[in-house]
């Protein structure tokens, strides 16, 4: 039996009215670890709001299995709304 391997996850900014992000910014996670070199700013308010979905995506749970067409979530800090999409990816070696 092979060992389970988590998915790497990136958060892509879909839209933003916040000065911390612009559309297209990305945040990269390798397991529970943030890739600081590749990532844009990290807002803990936003991340905390939808972290359970990030965790599920890391464990290879798909958007469809979670009941969504895509994993797009909004930061709850009003009025500076930011929409993030969670994307599972694998490094090409």
Q: PLM features: what roles do these ranges have?
A:
Residues 12-14, 30, 87-89:
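A structural detector for beta-sheet-dominated domains
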């Amino acid at each position: 039996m092979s060992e389970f391997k988590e998915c790497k996850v990136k958060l892509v900014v879909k839209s933003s009215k916040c000065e911390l992000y612009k559309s297209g910014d990305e945040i990269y996670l390798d397991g529970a670890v943030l890739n600081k070199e590749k990532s844009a700013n990290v807002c803990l308010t936003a991340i905390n709001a939808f972290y359970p979905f990030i965790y599920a995506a890391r464990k290879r749970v798909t958007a469809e299995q979670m009941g969504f067409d895509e994993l797009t979530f909004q930061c709850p800090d009003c009025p500076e709304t930011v929409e993030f999409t969670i994307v599972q990816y694998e490094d090409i070696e």
